[in-house]
A protein has these predicted regions:
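Alpha-helical subdomain
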Residues: 1-151
Length: 151
C-alpha cells in the first residue's frame, strides 16, 4: 500500500490479457508519458503464451509503441537446461493449472530481443545475471533473462 506519493512515485494495477496490447498500452498511458523512454518488463509472463498465440507479436507491438531509449526486460522458463527435470516440472504445472506453460529455448528467448541492443551479459540464466556473490552464481537457474535497449 502506498500511503503518500508524488506523481513520479505513482503506481497502478492493470488487469488485462497480455495479448491485448492496445489495452495494456492505454492503461500505461494513463500513468506514464509514453513519449519518454520507459521500461517494458515481461518478467515470468511470456511462457504463459503458447506459440500459436504469437508471443513475438506481443513483444513487437509493445516495443513499437515506446520510443528509442526504452528498455525491454524478459525472464522466461527455460526448455533447454536440466531438460528432464524441466520437462517433468512443465508436465506437473500444466496438469495442475488451467493456464498452460510453454517453456522456450535460449534461442527462442533471445529472438524476443530481435531489433534491440542487448545489455551485457545478454540472455543468460537468472543466476548468471550479474550475481552479487559466489553463492548467487552457484544457484542453478531455470529462467532465461535478458535486457535490451531500443535504439
Amino acid at each position: 500500500m502506498v500511503l503518500s506519493s508524488s506523481p513520479q512515485g505513482e503506481t497502478a494495477y492493470l488487469d488485462a490479457d497480455l495479448k491485448d496490447t492496445d489495452e495494456i498500452l492505454a492503461g500505461a498511458a494513463r500513468l506514464l508519458d509514453l513519449s519518454q523512454p520507459v521500461g517494458v518488463m515481461l518478467v515470468a509472463v511470456l511462457h504463459m503464451l503458447r506459440d500459436e498465440e504469437d508471443p513475438q507479436a506481443v513483444v513487437d507491438r509493445l516495443m513499437a509503441a515506446v520510443p528509442a531509449g526504452s528498455f525491454l526486460v524478459i525472464s522466461h522458463l527455460a526448455s533447454d537446461i536440466q531438460q528432464e527435470a524441466m520437462a517433468e516440472m512443465g508436465r506437473r504445472l500444466n496438469q495442475a493449472m488451467t493456464q498452460q506453460f510453454t517453456m522456450r529455448s535460449h534461442a527462442q528467448v533471445t529472438a524476443f530481443f530481435d531489433g534491440l541492443t542487448l545489455v551485457d551479459p545478454g540472455v543468460v540464466l537468472t543466476h548468471q545475471w550479474r550475481p552479487d556473490d559466489e553463492a548467487g552464481a552457484a544457484t542453478p537457474g531455470v529462467l532465461w533473462a535478458g535486457a535490451a535497449r531500443k535504439d
